[in-house]
A protein has these predicted regions:
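Domain-level signature for soluble enzymes in the chorismate/prephenate branch of the shikimate pathway
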Residues: 1-273
Length: 273
């Protein structure tokens, strides 16, 4: 997988500062409140941001941004799709997505796929929940009953680092990788999370440049910020951090499927910066 072929070189104003320890870093103005998911998949985009970052599970992170308690956050895609027009500006060129098996977002099932009747949904990320509904309902023509985590179910949705831990501990179980299933039916990558900004245009534009620079640094240092061989494989092979034409087409396709099944009222017009 080629890393970030779509992004231009950093502008001079976005140059990183070299810290005493020898590692570069990007300093976001102290007045800007930054949030991110706490998972490994966000590390390349956040590792070189020197400013404080609130790290929250996806659902809570989205709620904090929506409430105005954060100015920018690496939120699940559904937060942007469900919000009124002009609520957010999306930082262009960078996102958390996958071109193939993402490994950390899947359905773990105990009966043949076609016989799934009940699914326990992880409420932590609405994007993954909605993607699971698309794959089971639209692609596989199933109508399972969705239940809360912990209830008896034929399948369960797991995401993020807990999903990685479970999968590594139980390799013999059955897994439906949601990014793989999406690609098989659409031919497109899937975008799980984006940087969403709630600031005036002039502030958002400057911040977007800083976030892109931090992200480029993280992607170029992936081997160094990976603590294990698996983490290196996960960050370089399972994830894609581009937000280019194909990813934007995938976002539009996902939004259209949610409108068709009445999970979204209308296809939103997104603003990239």
């Amino acid at each position: 997988m080629k890393a970030l072929s779509l992004v231009p070189k950093p502008k001079p104003a976005d140059k990183a500062i070299i810290e005493p320890g020898g590692l570069p870093s990007i300093h976001i103005p102290a007045a800007i409140r930054v949030g991110s998911v706490p998972y490994l998949n966000a590390r390349p985009l956040t590792r070189f941001i020197a400013s404080p970052i609130a790290k929250l599970e996806p659902k809570k992170l989205a709620a904090e941004l929506r409430a105005g308690k954060l100015d920018v956050a690496l939120v699940p895609l559904m937060e942007v799709l469900e919000s009124p027009a002009n609520t957010y500006r999306i930082v262009d060129e960078l996102a958390i997505g996958s071109e193939r098996a993402v490994y950390s977002v899947y359905l773990n099932y105990s009966v043949p796929l076609a016989k799934i009747k009940t699914v326990a949904l992880d409420p932590a990320s609405k994007t993954s929940v909605e993607l699971a509904r698309v794959i089971l309902g639209k692609f596989h023509r199933l109508k399972p009953r969705y239940v809360a985590p912990g209830e008896p179910a034929d399948a369960q949705l797991l995401i993020g680092d807990p999903a990685i831990t479970h999968r590594q501990a139980h390799p013999e179980q059955n897994y439906l990788d949601l990014a793989t299933a999406w690609r098989e039916h659409t031919g497109l990558p899937f975008v799980f999370a984006v940087w969403a900004v709630r600031l005036p245009y002039w502030k958002a534009r400057s911040l977007a440049g800083q976030l892109r620079t931090a992200g480029r640094l993280g992607l170029s240092w992936r081997d160094a910020i990976a603590h294990t061989p698996f983490e290196r494989q996960y960050l370089t092979e399972h994830l894609c951090y581009d937000l280019g034409p194909r990813q934007k087409k995938a976002i539009e396709k996902f939004a259209e499927t949610r409108v068709q099944t009445e999970r979204l009222a209308t296809t939103p017009k997104l603003s990239y910066i």
